[in-house]
């Protein structure tokens, strides 16, 4: 079993080692190229692979709620606002982009993204649906980074009992 959160530059090497040794892979690496994603999905034929942009149970639930809201409110404006600490490099974050993919799949709309880098914020994501006279906001706030490690260990435990395939965090819930 390998758990990998490195940069995209190291991803291909760890995937190759897992395939060679027939070991499961849990990856939280964001910023992967389309080619790397395809390689990961293809490798799912050979080993169990789980990829997630975020290993928080709360974000997994948020994603499901966003999917439902996106189906019902597809004629509303949709914005995703995310905030992280000042040292976070990618903007928008991988989690914001994943939420955006959920919005697109559910509603057919591309959301607007707004990224903040401030202080020591662990991670906040809000998906806002707005229409004339009303607004629905779905928000998740991480206040402690331990939740991500706990989620990765949960994923590793669950994926170890799964057959070969490509999985996402929500598939384990």
Language-model segment annotations:
Residues 25-27, 76-77:
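Short N-terminal helix-initiation segments at or just after the protein's N-terminus
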Residues 51-59, 85-92:
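Short, surface-exposed loop/turn motifs that are enriched in glycine and acidic residues
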Residues 74-173:
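C-terminal substrate-binding/catalytic lobe of Rossmann-fold NAD(P)-dependent oxidoreductases
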Residues 9-21, 27-51, 57-69:
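Rossmann-fold NAD(P)-binding glycine/threonine-rich loop
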Residues 2-3:
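N-terminal Rossmann-like NAD(P) cofactor-binding module of classical short-chain dehydrogenase/reductase
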